[in-house]
Amino acid sequence: MSGHSKWSTIKRKKGTLDAKRNKIFTKLIREISIAARMGGGDIDSNPRLRLAVNKARVANMPKDNIEKAIKKGIGDNMGSEYFKLTYEAYALYGVALIIKCLTDNKNRTASEVRSVLSKSGGSLGAPGSVSYMFHKKGLISYNLDKYHEDEIIELALEAGAEDIYSEGSQVEVITSADNFESVSSILRTKFEEDIAEVALVPESKVALDKEQMDKVLAIIEKLEDCDDVQEVYHNLEIVDDIC
């Protein structure tokens, strides 16, 4: 078991959730509804829906909102057809970005993403130009205020986890993308996770000084503010106390 989590800075800290709550909720509702429409409204038998609902719970979305989003999806009242898009790009200083989008208008989304990048000094890359720098991993996180660390570790290893990281009041179980569902299902029989998702993890990270890091984080924030952007993965080394 490793002592320090390599996951703690994979995705940029979003700051105060309240400031962006409406935008975040809108994106999550869309994701939940589409997952329900594609795979049904049963969370236990629809992995994509389960992941979407878990994200909503982490964001403190009210249960009523989640249920309405599921009903909207299975009722097929969504209107427009939605598409999943992935853009590979570069921010400043060679930082690689993978931008995951969910949209009902491909041209609008492409224009918005391209505009943010060009105005900020970044650029879109060709397919494959960035994706080779990342690999998929499963992340399942637990709060140690609720459970005993040794019990989580024991069951996680028995279930086939690749690694386990302990930091502060959190234990993070790492799995392969293929084993994520089976490991998380086994752990769920005894523990309720705080986070459960499949994410893109960089093979290595780019270290910058504070001024450079802040510029890159500003680009990521602008991309995340786009209505159609669901996730922005990057290989920036984020250091909170950098001088």
From Swiss-Prot:
Q: Name one GO molecular function term.
A: DNA binding
Location, primary (coarse class): cytoplasm
Q: Give the GO biological process terms.
A: regulation of DNA-templated transcription
Origin: domain of life: Bacteria
Keyword 4Fe-4S tagged: no
**Keywords in UniProt for this one?**
Cytoplasm, DNA-binding, Transcription, Transcription regulation
- Record's subcellular location: Cytoplasm
One GO cellular component term = cytosol
Q: Which InterPro entries match?
A: Integrase-like_N, TACO1_YebC-like_2nd/3rd_dom, TACO1_YebC_N, Transcrip_reg_TACO1-like, Transcrip_reg_TACO1-like_dom3, YebC-like
* UniProt keyword annotation of Cell membrane present: no
**Protein family per UniProt:** Belongs to the TACO1 family.
Q: What is this protein called?
A: Probable transcriptional regulatory protein BRE_29
